[in-house]
Amino acid sequence: MSQLTIALTKGRILEETLPLLSAAGIEPLEDIQKSRKLLFETSSQNVRLLILRGVDVPTYVEFGAADVGVSGKDTLIEHNSKSYYEPLDLHIAKCRMMTAGIKGVPQKSGRIRVATKYVGLARQYYAEQGRQVDIIKLYGAMELAPIMNLCDEIVDIVDTGNTLRANGLEPRETICEISSRLIVNKASMKMKHREIEALIDAVSAAVNERIAA
């Protein structure tokens, strides 16, 4: 059998992906959360796990450094590549991509400034709304931007909305629903079709069982 390399990222996605892989007979031989290693052998001799930054998972899969990856839909939209397949919605790490602004402050009708990590997605969304915006790219602490008058709105991932409210902001419009997806390198799908199809089938069954529970 051919070796499969699966790219994952630490955090919530990893925590919710590992049980799905376990159901497919793939378990890391070491505790990923406690290790500083980035490459892990598994209980399946022909499968290894690669731990990356979330934004790098699609790149590794696109260029074939990993055969398979698990990535949030937000990252995939921003990556904007057609160089891999997206065969499976894992229905994990669910959240929403939303606009938000200072609570009680009405939305401005003219040109506005928007701070976000998701520049491509935000630009597309506001263009579809027919609104003129200046996009400011930030990498974190998004909630500070409106408070410090850096922008009028932010575009960010929202789970419960508690962080927004704690910083005097309120969610406004939902841009899209987000969940984690299984992605596959196109060449790997051809060269390792049997192994990857078996993985997809096993993980899909685990996803369906989880949803039904």
UniProtKB/Swiss-Prot annotation:
GO process annotations (BP): L-histidine biosynthetic process
Top-rank EC class of the record's enzyme: transferase
Keyword check for Transmembrane helix: no
Catalysed conversion reaction: 1-(5-phospho-beta-D-ribosyl)-ATP + diphosphate = 5-phospho-alpha-D-ribose 1-diphosphate + ATP
Subunit composition and interactions: Heteromultimer composed of HisG and HisZ subunits.
Entry function: Catalyzes the condensation of ATP and 5-phosphoribose 1-diphosphate to form N'-(5'-phosphoribosyl)-ATP (PR-ATP). Has a crucial role in the pathway because the rate of histidine biosynthesis seems to be controlled primarily by regulation of HisG enzymatic activity.
Protein name, per record: ATP phosphoribosyltransferase
Organism the protein comes from: Teredinibacter turnerae (strain ATCC 39867 / T7901)
